[in-house]
Amino acid sequence: MSRFRILSVGRGMPKHEKGLFDDYAGRMKRYGGLELVEIAEGQRTGKESPATRSKAIADEGERILEKMDKRLWMALDRGGKLLDSETLAAQLLRWQEAGDRDVGLIIGGPDGLHERVLQGVAFKLAFGPMTFPHMLVRVMLAEQLYRAMTLQHGVPYHR
């Protein structure tokens, strides 16, 4: 059984996305559980200078690093590896078999993750070159974790 934790920059989810996330989190209970920890977003105005944007990313990075415990960590990153669902399930299983039962996943803010956070993870995962709303990425990640667990346990969910 693995316990999964998602650290995600941004607070609050719209009702529909929250309902979807909560559905997958509920399904994950039988596989060890899925927890969401929200990280406050760095201050942005929409017209900030590169220095202000860098400070916001650094502030978010500090808050993320404070929440990272001893579990194995993955980060969603545009430059990360593209995996299909079966390969993600197999990778998670390899980590579990190697003793890394608890896995954490990090979703950055609108400007990505600070380099210190990226240096502290074991794996960088990409959902592709497109940009997605961060609240929807939470749902997509929860669904992929659930799909991975059903693949590992032979549950007929993945087709």
Swiss-Prot record:
Quaternary structure (record): Homodimer.
Record-listed E.C. numbers: 2.1.1.177
Signal peptide: none
Locations listed in the record: Cytoplasm
Presence of keyword Nucleotide-binding: no
Entry keyword annotation includes Methyltransferase: yes
Name of this protein: Ribosomal RNA large subunit methyltransferase H
InterPro entries given in the database record: Alpha/beta_knot_MTases, RlmH-like, tRNA_m1G_MTases_N
Major site of localization recorded for this protein: cytoplasm
Protein function: Specifically methylates the pseudouridine at position 1915 (m3Psi1915) in 23S rRNA.
Family: Belongs to the RNA methyltransferase RlmH family.
CDD domains: RlmH-like (cd18081)
Class of enzymatic activity (EC top level): transferase
Reactions performed catalytically: pseudouridine(1915) in 23S rRNA + S-adenosyl-L-methionine = N(3)-methylpseudouridine(1915) in 23S rRNA + S-adenosyl-L-homocysteine + H(+)
Disulfide bond sites: none
GO (cellular component) term, any one: cytoplasm
GO molecular function terms attached to this record: rRNA (pseudouridine-N3-)-methyltransferase activity
Top-level taxon in the UniProt lineage: Bacteria
Keywords, sorted A to Z: Cytoplasm, Methyltransferase, rRNA processing, S-adenosyl-L-methionine, Transferase
Binding positions for S-adenosyl-L-methionine per the UniProt entry: G108, F127, G128, P129, M130, T131, F132
HAMAP family in UniProt: 23SrRNA_methyltr_H (MF_00658)
PANTHER family documented for this protein: METHYLTRANSFERASE (PTHR33603), RIBOSOMAL RNA LARGE SUBUNIT METHYLTRANSFERASE H (PTHR33603:SF1)
